[in-house]
Amino acid sequence: MLKKVTPLFLVAAVAACSSPLERRQANGGEDYVQAEQAPMLKIPEGLKTPPYNKEYDVPALGPKANPALVGKNLDIRPPLQVLPMAEGTHVEEGSDNIKIVVESIDNNVDLKQEIFTNLDDFFAKQAIPIRSRDFDKGSIETDWIESREVLESSLWGSDKEYLLRQRYRFDVETRPHGRTANIVIHLVEHEEFYDGKEQKVMLSGEDKQRYTIDMLNSAIAYMSVKREQTIQANRLKQTLGINVDLITPEEGAAYWSAKAAYKQVWDRLRIVLPEMGFEISDMDSAKGLYFIKFTDNSGFWSSLWNNNQLSLKEGSYRLLLEDGDTPDETKIWLRDAEDQPLSNDVVSKVYESLSSLMKEERKLR
């Protein structure tokens, strides 16, 4: 079948095209492969051996070096570098593989689920088929990923095409504490074809590493975008005001009910408490405790609250946070240094200052 082509294409068609196999090979001859090492000079007895310059001596092969990687078998391309661009990630290089260590950036999100969701979205966006997926084992194996490139175009017949087919496996290992996980990628299968004929390619460890790094960088780059979106959303959420209600039960001490998740309330209190005149001397987020100290500062309160000072004695106090009855509620108790509840009247008066600052919207920093 005769193809319609433009004159520009005719000019391009006669230009030599290098195949992916040739791109990894050095240009020029390979006579050096057959080169023989010249013997050392034989010095007659009685004469001194002249000094030799060892600057250009070729070092001996190491125990892990492959002696077959010479000539056309030697890949001259520079190595690829792993780019841990996503927030909370870094690289750990082992003897057999390269892994990305991913740290949690949001305690309210399951890290393993976040990684799997990002990988699923990445595969869908890149139209990469999946052969198997096992969340419990932390493994995703792709089906064949094909890349085609036309190397020779014919006017009267079919084009000669180069085809690269690969399959990868992503392993996700989460630490028992759930705050750190590892992502390791393996090249499971690799095939190369030219004009329908399979090419015999000897992949070295560096070749496999090159392909896996390229795929790993693409996946991490996608995760970087998603994590940045999450960080921006969380920062915006932190700027929003939090409504706080005063709860005075018939029995028991009065407390405050903040209409937000525990982490959001905890972070907001770190800003609000100093503005109320409290000094944070210590804190324990796992136990939900703020150890605070109050010092009466009339000048501060006069300017901020129109001479309406907190009805608190100077001294040390504790602020206790607990999860509420719903995920969007956090309960807050104000207690003295001996962990005893304060009177409902004091809690009620402090509430006026606390609620006003908590519901105030902040500028995004």
Swiss-Prot record:
**What does UniProt give as GO cellular component?**
cell outer membrane
Q: Where does it reside?
A: Cell outer membrane
Per the UniProt entry, the signal peptide is 1-16
Which PROSITE patterns does UniProt cross-reference here? PROKAR_LIPOPROTEIN
Which positions anchor the lipid (N-palmitoyl cysteine)?
C17
Q: Which domain of life is it from?
A: Bacteria
Q: Where is the lipid attached (S-diacylglycerol cysteine)?
A: C17
One GO biological process term is: protein insertion into membrane
The record ties this protein, via InterPro entries, to: BamC (IPR014524), BamC_C (IPR042268), NlpB/DapX (IPR010653)
UniProtKB keywords: Cell outer membrane, Lipoprotein, Membrane, Palmitate, Signal
Q: How the protein sits in the membrane? A: Lipid-anchor
The record's listing under Gene3D superfamilies reads:
3.30.530.50, Outer membrane protein assembly factor BamC
Broad class of the protein's primary localization:
membrane
Subunit-structure text: Part of the Bam complex.
Chain's role: Part of the outer membrane protein assembly complex, which is involved in assembly and insertion of beta-barrel proteins into the outer membrane.
Q: Give the similarity note.
A: Belongs to the BamC family.
- Recorded protein name is Outer membrane protein assembly factor BamC
